[in-house]
Amino acid sequence: MKATFPLLTGLAAALLAGAPKAMADRDSDFWLPENMAKNECTSVHITYGPKEDTHTAAYQEVVVEKSAPGSYFACNNFTTGYIGVQQLVENYKDGTPVRVAIFSVWDAKDSGDNPHAAPESERAKLIQRGPKVMTDRFGGEGTGGKSMRVFDWKEGDVIRTLVVEKPDGEDFRQITGYIFDPETQKWELMSSWRVQALRRGLGGGCGFVEDFRRNGESRFHERRATFGPALRYVNGVWKPATEFTMTKDANPNMNINCRFNPARGYFSLATGGDIAENPDFRVFETHELPQQPAPVAVDPAVQKLVEAPLLPVKEQEPYTEPRWQELDMED
């Protein structure tokens, strides 16, 4: 059958995926740790260190080794947004999963979870979107602007992302997300947003693995990915992350781990299924890589994007229809 997908992320995507409606209320019992344990895999994160809050660009590589319906593999969760890839719950008629890329930027100020509550002057303003990219407002986990596109990544692929911040006068900044498309062999624009400059620098920086299906059954499926290299651009110099910290959410399930992946030379995160803890890398511990990774030569195309001039700001770029293109889905 033909189906259209609402352009949803976070809580809204989980509701579409069959999770209980109670999860839309952050004060509901759904979010009690004991109930989280029954409904979902534990969310696990890996922070890229040392801390470089003033960096103005961030390049990450992630390899997904194992996925499941309703999975989010964030390549970079910076202070005011995130970029990564997802496997949706639905499949195409031939049984292959629907997979997408996502880039979101939060509004500069906290306006709760209602995307319509933020004053227009405080909203992230869409400047430009890439081909095949859909854009809209989001809520439910703070508020801001989101962009998504069909992106047929595979297990074992090297997923490459880039986020760039540029000052836009004294009061604003532009934040732009790109993803490398292996089919075109080019960096492709996800979207660019203009936000109030309450801070400078992308800040933060971590990857995570999340089960957003949260329907009880999804916790029995393993999700695993390796994160790195991670480079931050500080004062004109690319600096690699050299230490990594594992964290988790409030879910008490401990079938999670972080361990060194010698094939990639970086740490992997895993959650769900029959995963067992790694006693050599426990939650909230920080570790350096056990062996020196190969030097990363920054793609000249990446440097060109980092050094590109500001985009012209006119009127708000109109959002796309908040639905996916028609896809040939299973009945």
Q: Where are the language model's segments positioned?
A:
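Activation corresponds to long, low-complexity, non-globular regions
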Residues: R26-G70, G205-V209, R214-D331
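N-terminal signal peptide c-region/cleavage motif recognized by signal peptidases
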Residues: A17-A19
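Bacterial N-terminal signal peptides
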Residues: T9-L15
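Secretory/extracellular carbohydrate-interaction modules
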Residues: D25-K132, L305-E307
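Short, aromatic/His-centered strand-loop micro-motif at the edge of beta-sheets
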Residues: F138-V158
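Carbohydrate-binding surfaces in secreted/extracellular proteins
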Residues: W153-E188
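Bacterial N-terminal signal peptides that target proteins for export
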Residues: M1-L8
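Short, basic/aromatic beta-hairpin or loop at an interaction surface
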Residues: G130-G140
